Design a protein with these regions (language model features):
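ATP-binding N-terminal substructure of ATP-dependent carboxylate-amine bond-forming enzymes
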Residues: 1-88, 102
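Active-site nucleotide/adenylate-binding loops and adjacent lid/helix of ATP-dependent enzymes
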Residues: 3-8, 15-20, 49-51, 55-56, ...
């Protein structure tokens, strides 16, 4: 099979591991940097170009899309799907993983245990915090990655102050 890894970092360990594993299984492997892919629809057909060369020989793609390129990465995966190229991860799954509340809902749907989690949408901040009975509260921004946007509030006043600031700034968050 001809397989492309969609990755900005060809030298990353995870990308190299996938390349080696695919090559070991006799697949033809390559890395396509999504930022060098252009998409078009020509004569009713989806077309992907990589550095101005049409990509039309792939059987499958392995998306490794960074958080900063989520929307474009999902669009690229959909475009390859329209070209009958299999993807190990759907565009919808890529989008779902970027939102912590959506992930929590999906985990709950399949009975995966997670800590008590409350969406920070209520205008009644005291009610939100009353669910934690003077315990430390972890406040997570919905779209943060790699630990960015995770705040530990050690007490009620700290949590209340942080939540008020986030709500004033229009930042979506959850509490655990």
């Amino acid at each position: 099979m001809n397989i492309a890894i969609l990755s900005k970092g060809e030298t990353l360990y995870s990308t190299q591991s996938l390349l080696k594993a695919g090559t070991k299984r006799k697949h033809v492997m390559e890395v396509l940097d999504p930022s060098h892919c252009s998409l078009s629809i020509e004569n009713g057909k989806s077309v992907v170009r990589f550095h101005d060369e049409i990509v039309d020989d792939l059987d499958a793609i392995i998306p490794r899309i960074g958080a900063s390129r989520t929307y474009y990465g999902a669009t690229l995966v959909r475009h390859f799907n329209a070209m009958n190229v299999f993807s190990v991860v759907s565009a919808e799954a890529i989008l779902q993983t970027r939102d912590k509340w959506t992930c929590s809902q999906l985990l709950s749907r399949f009975n995966v245990p997670i800590p008590k989690t409350i969406l920070g949408s209520s205008s009644n901040l005291e009610y939100l915090l009353s669910n934690f009975k003077n315990e430390s509260v972890i406040i997570k921004i919905l779209e943060g990655t790699h630990g960015n946007g995770v705040i530990l509030a050690d007490n009620y006043l700290s949590a209340l102050s942080t939540i008020e600031t986030l709500k004033t700034a229009g930042v979506k968050f959850l509490l655990q």
